Amino acid sequence: MKRFLFISLIFLTAVSATAQTFHGYVYYQKPNGGTEPLPFAQVYHMEREKLIETDANGEFTLKLTARATLIATYVGYTRDTVVVEPGTAEAKFYLTGENDLDESKVVAQQSTMPKLKSIKTEVITAAGLCKMACCALAESFENSASVTVGFSDAVTGARQIKLLGLSGTYTQMLDENRPVMRGIAAPFGMSFVPGQWLESIQIAKGPSSVINGLEAITGQINMEHRKPTDETPLFVQVYGSTDAMFEGNVASAIQFNEKWSMINMVHVGGTASKMDHNQDGFRDEPEDLQLNFTSRWLYYAPSGMQIRFGGRFLYDDRLGGQMGATKDNAFNLENRIWGSSIKNRGVNGYFKIGVPLAEDNHANIALVADFNHHEFDSFFGLKNYDAKQNSAFANLIYQNEINETHKVEFGATWQFDDLTQLYSRDDFSRWENAISGFGEYTLTPGDKFTFVGGLNLQYNSLHGWLFAPRANVRWAPVDWVTLRALGGRGYRTANIFTDNLGIFSTGKNFVIPDQLDLLEDAWTWGGNVTFYLPFGAEDTETYLSFDYFHNDFNKQVVVDPERNMLAIDFYNLDGKSYTNTWQVDFSVNPLERFNITATFRYTDAKVTLKDKGLVERPMTSRYKGVLNMQYATAMNKWTFDFTAQLNGPMRLPKYAAQVWGMETSPVFPMLYAQITRKFKGIDIYVGAENILGYRQHHAIIGAEDPFGINFGVGDTHTMASSSHIPQIFDASNVWGPLMGRKFYIGLRYTLWK
């Protein structure tokens, strides 16, 4: 009852208004003083949280009834902000090129915490993605305390994230608001998105909107890719590091005419050789080769109709395990060589169409469709797991901005999954079909208050009827304080193998009941207060922000490595499972072009385990602190970045704790630094990661005999009291970095129109 009261607290009465048509024009201001229209530039209406796109002539129209703050942006250009007073008929926006080094104007950086969004959203901009190497999406969160990144195990190289103290499987991943990285595509999904393909990343905590489905439990991470309308006919990036990692990216955007444009992006990367820094006989990271290609197209009609479509091809092949392992000798007990081979292949296609139903675009209808085929073939020692998944998604959305105060959105969604998966001759295949209807209402009586409430009703072929209410509210009582609250319900179908990939890198058996309920059901609610402080360099924003979020599961699939030393138990939750997360963020520019951002997050995560009761959730970091400093010289010719992390302890699973002689992992620091030199069209950057060289030593238990049980012989260096504790092979308890100090160098070349 309390949850429903929380969701329905803030429904208010309607307010009507009279609108006037406003005309805007966005131009590129050339270094020689000339101008030219910027087609398909984006204009953000801050008070209404609406994104508008200019037409082929750089023009747009908007219905206005009150004072409006409009921000015009275009990839590779500065932004321009215009405050439009009531009665203003038109305004012009002038953007300059970021690489016009003869300009004296310094490029403004986008705030990483938008002030007027109803949901607190952390934005990692293109400039933020360049603060570190960010070879892939998985490596883009090192400056964020909201998201914790680690390895699922010490063998496969699969990176996993945690948000609000829970696995990334409870975070909905979106590609320009299309659900992605679902099912068997999830374990390595973040490694399959090159960082240089991205324009920005938005991190929103909590269940968010009902429009994109029910799977957002702890939050949503949305990726914005480079656009077909980019003014970059050619972008090239190359990268290499001391741990044998290499990467190359090429992107090319072409505007054929006023209607058609496209962008192609190619990625080649991987790890070229094997290394064993801690001398345990296992590769520190797998040898890997990844090929990635995408093509994205845009058609823009004079009527305002837009069609976007594209496709993607992925190939990834990795080999891990003992140093002597090959694909020919690893899957064989007679050789006594433990190896891991994982091959991912994927094909994706999508289609979007948006049709305006009014001249000023206050009403429109859109269809989003997506198809994904993914294959996952693997073995881990003597365990083999092969899977194939076909997924289809369609979302029909009607949107109507009735006036400045009221907006409604409603529609229908279809989600289909055909999953074939075999583990050691056992068939765990399933077929799932879900159809849902949704509605969402937005109330904005002024620029100080926003309420969004939505409902999603779904019929699922596996789980029956599912009902998800969600709501969020923003209130700014004064200009320098913003308060937000949100709450809602989320559901997902557990994928017991790929959600927990690290379990394959053990010598343990799996105990899976025949009647295991795969439905996971949770409520999440929380709030935020942000203070905008009156100090700092001119034209910058100083803020202090406090968050609290609570997550509570009604249903959950529990993966228990502690009940039985020789097995991993799967069972349905019988008791409580919850997390409490507190976070504080502070950002200031004490000097022009010098930014300091500090963040601290504390998590209290509990779960009920059989025979143990309610305990601290294992392998969940209690806290994380991040300090980032960036300084740029005039015109951004030189940029210096430094990041320091303090990673808090995790409770270790029972048997790992006994072997290592410690109940929790140690607190450890991580330091990163990068220097970038910008020339006209070329950026050269050098950097270092894990500067202190901190590593988790002996991360693999029983590495001497991965096919048997070791009673301490030859492994007593892990702890003094472990000599009589049976040690079964287990590489799944990773709490720290596996690689030592790393240096890298890279180059980015951009050809501008």
Language model: regions and residue ranges:
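C-terminal beta-signal and adjacent terminal beta-strands/loops
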Residues: 4, 646-653, 676-753
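Short, acidic, small-residue-rich periplasmic hinge/interaction motif at the N-terminus
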Residues: 31-33, 39-46, 73-77, 88-130, ...
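Short acidic/polar hinge/loop motifs at secondary-structure boundaries
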Residues: 61-63, 178-205, 293
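N-terminal periplasmic accessory domains that precede
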Residues: 88-94, 137-140, 159-162, 189-194, ...
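Extracytoplasmic beta-strand/coil segments of soluble accessory domains associated
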Residues: 138-179
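Flexible loop and strand-edge segments within Gram-negative outer membrane beta-barrel domains
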Residues: 271-292, 298-365, 371-389
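Membrane-embedded beta-barrel scaffold of Gram-negative outer-membrane proteins
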Residues: 364-378, 476, 484, 518-572, ...
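Gram-negative outer-membrane beta-barrel transporters
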Residues: 544-552, 572-655, 748-750
